[in-house]
Amino acid sequence: MLLEQLKQAAEQRHALALTRRRRIAHTACAPHQAVGEEGTESESLLTFCSNDYLGLANHPQVIAALVEGAQRYGAGSGASHLVSGHSLAHAQLEAELARWFAPHIAQARTLYFCTGYMANMAVLTALGAAGATLFCESLNHASLIDGARLARADVQRYPHCDTDALQALLAASTSARKLIVTDSVFSMDGNVAPLRRLLELAERHDAWIVVDDAHGFGVLGEQGHGVLEALGLSSERLIYIGTLGKAAGVAGAFVAAHATIIEHLVNTARPYIYTTAAPPAVAHALLASLAIIEGDEGRQRRAQLARCIATLREGLAQLAASAGWTLGDSQTAVQPLIVGDNGAALALSAALEADGIRVGAIRPPTVPEGTARLRITLSAAHTEADVRRLLEALSAAVAQREAA
């Protein structure tokens, strides 16, 4: 019975052009990457779908630090953080990140997690106790949605970036613990949440803000410290979650918050307590990555990323209008080209791959029905010539479609 049910579900996904499949990367994460299917030869594709925004995943200094960390600490941690798996490298990483966020969060401490998904789940389940209310942005990442579902708190959703609707919900709430939960840079749209206004509402209504800055950390701000630095925000009411497997180029995530909140997470957050700690070598590599992000090279890489974004948007503006597509209102590394139909998005992605370019087609349920899209992501490792090559391939795909 179970297998028949699952086969029927698979057939339904296929009929709706919603089947997902994995590809195999044969080389390091980089703009030009060898990609193949299981049992087939790989081919080199110009890739615009990774989240390696600063091009650090293949940086020689980060790789060298990873090797050095493995030689010093071994391949694995051997236990959870609260048993014997918390290494000097983990402690040094948390201390360095706490320094970064001291200007923005009173009595800042940080806590390192194996993944961003775990960090989001941990914060919402540990703080979303019975009697609390989570006020969740409608386009939050799946990990925030799942964390809210597992929390014992009441959950109320507000429309995308609609601070008036949120204010009404906050004003009507009698909850003793209120948490506003939002992405900073929305992962499928690339736009930035109105965090300054959200913080004003939090202070007015005695609420706290949980900010998932997965796509802003390392990229936004003069030093790459993320959205709080970029907007000049500071408050003890901020609970910041940053990802270390995207712009930082390695793996994991962290929570930055008031020391009392971090201590609560250490003692009550099940995704932190009941899992083996990440390899210390990963934390050691991240220290090298953070030094690059904060230094002159990081500034240069962010400037290169900004040039690539400007080149792409200039070219896509005309192309999207002529093709009947919608270019999302994004100034970040995430550039959504909304096609609408699932099949059309898949066909466009396939046409690009036939031309040697890899861009993922994003479909429901990841995005709302009728908004299937190409999610184009840029990296500082891309050149402006790479971006122009993508624009040429998109133009050719449009011409081919019109000729048919």
UniProtKB/Swiss-Prot annotation:
Its cofactor is pyridoxal 5'-phosphate. Gene3D superfamilies: Aspartate Aminotransferase, domain 1, Type I PLP-dependent aspartate aminotransferase-like (Major domain). Substrate binds at R20, H141, T366. Pathway: Cofactor biosynthesis; biotin biosynthesis. Coiled coil: none annotated. It catalyses: 6-carboxyhexanoyl-[ACP] + L-alanine + H(+) = (8S)-8-amino-7-oxononanoate + holo-[ACP] + CO2. One of its GO terms (molecular function) is pyridoxal phosphate binding. Pyridoxal 5'-phosphate binds at G116, Y117, S187, H215, T243. The keyword Cell inner membrane does not apply. Its EC number is 2.3.1.47. Keywords: Biotin biosynthesis, Pyridoxal phosphate, Transferase. The modification N6-(pyridoxal phosphate)lysine is found at K246. Belongs to the class-II pyridoxal-phosphate-dependent aminotransferase family. BioF subfamily. PANTHER family: 8-AMINO-7-OXONONANOATE SYNTHASE (PTHR13693:SF100), CLASS II AMINOTRANSFERASE/8-AMINO-7-OXONONANOATE SYNTHASE (PTHR13693). Catalyzes the decarboxylative condensation of pimeloyl-[acyl-carrier protein] and L-alanine to produce 8-amino-7-oxononanoate (AON), [acyl-carrier protein], and carbon dioxide. Homodimer. HAMAP family: BioF_aminotrans_2. This is 8-amino-7-oxononanoate synthase. It comes from Cupriavidus taiwanensis (strain DSM 17343 / BCRC 17206 / CCUG 44338 / CIP 107171 / LMG 19424 / R1) (Ralstonia taiwanensis (strain LMG 19424)).
